[in-house]
């Protein structure tokens, strides 16, 4: 029986042990659900990450893997991906001649990810059965990492629109922790303006929703910025929501990306990764296409 390509989950670097444990939990979940597929995960783009991507590659090779389908665990394409992820994979492949790999698309605002974001909002509002008016007086600030790449920032705006559609919230605004505007305080100002439409007897409130998969330094910076703004605006209720986390829906979305990557490049032959080339070859829906052929054409 032929062993299927291994699944390598690539998270953007964190030095936070909580983020590393969340990735481990997702890897365990996928391994339990799909025992036929070798699974590992690691971080790229940050020195001294607790789970280096290269170690994850080494571990899969030790388990007999010769082909890898790499899925970037990112809510949106970020600036470092076109360089940092292929570079990390190339360094790992140099240690393992003959290793083949192909890079799939990031998760983005996948419907299953949106389901988790909606659940995080309900949890922040107290959970349980809620009346439509509870959402109607709630404005959401969806906060992304922020990048120099405008396509990455546009993906956050797209996620905000999809999250708002049909869910009954007063509005969903966007902000970024760094490297892009609006920043968190400006985003909260915009949410406050939307909330001002609520009656004086039932004032509006803001839920700050991190568009991150795992906890880490970015989440801490976001919380500090939101808490500072809230302290300066005591009449506005500001509630912090949790990160997406290693949920079953995330595991399902990862497997969808895995299957699509294998189907697009069934042989997964040759050490190639289209993450760099994809920055200039985006699909019409805004998703970056990553193909081995594109990488072979100009990224050797």
Language model features with spans:
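Active-site-proximal alpha-helix that buttresses catalytic centers in soluble enzyme cores
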Residues: 1-300
């Amino acid at each position: 029986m032929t062993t299927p390509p291994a699944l390598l989950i690539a998270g953007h670097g964190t030095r936070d042990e909580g983020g590393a444990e969340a990735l481990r939990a997702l890897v365990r979940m996928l391994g339990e659900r799909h025992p036929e597929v070798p699974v590992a995960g690691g971080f790229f783009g940050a020195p001294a990450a607790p789970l280096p991507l290269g170690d994850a590659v080494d571990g899969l090779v030790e388990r007999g893997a010769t082909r890898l389908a790499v899925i970037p665990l990112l809510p949106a394409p970020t600036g470092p991906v076109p360089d940092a992820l292929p570079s990390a994979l190339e360094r790992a492949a140099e240690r393992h001649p003959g290793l083949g790999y192909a890079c799939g698309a990031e998760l983005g605002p996948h419907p299953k990810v949106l389901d988790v974001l909606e659940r995080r909002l309900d949890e922040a509002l107290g959970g349980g059965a809620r009346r439509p008016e509870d959402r109607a007086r709630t404005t959401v600030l969806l906060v992304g990492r922020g990048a120099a790449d405008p396509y990455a920032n546009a993906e956050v705006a797209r996620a905000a629109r999809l999250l708002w559609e049909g869910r009954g919230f007063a509005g969903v605004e966007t902000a970024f922790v760094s490297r892009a505007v609006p920043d968190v305080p400006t985003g909260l100002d915009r949410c406050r303006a939307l909330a001002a439409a609520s009656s004086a007897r039932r004032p509006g409130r803001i839920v700050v929703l991190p568009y991150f998969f795992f906890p880490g330094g970015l989440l801490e910076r976001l919380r500090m910025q939101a808490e500072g703004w809230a302290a300066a605006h005591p009449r506005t209720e500001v509630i912090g929501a949790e990160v997406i986390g290693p949920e079953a829906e995330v595991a399902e979305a990862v497997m969808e990306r895995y299957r699509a990557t294998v189907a697009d490049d069934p042989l997964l032959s040759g050490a190639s990764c289209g993450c760099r080339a994809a920055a200039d070859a985006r699909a019409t829906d805004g998703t970056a296409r990553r193909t081995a052929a594109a990488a072979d054409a100009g990224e050797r």
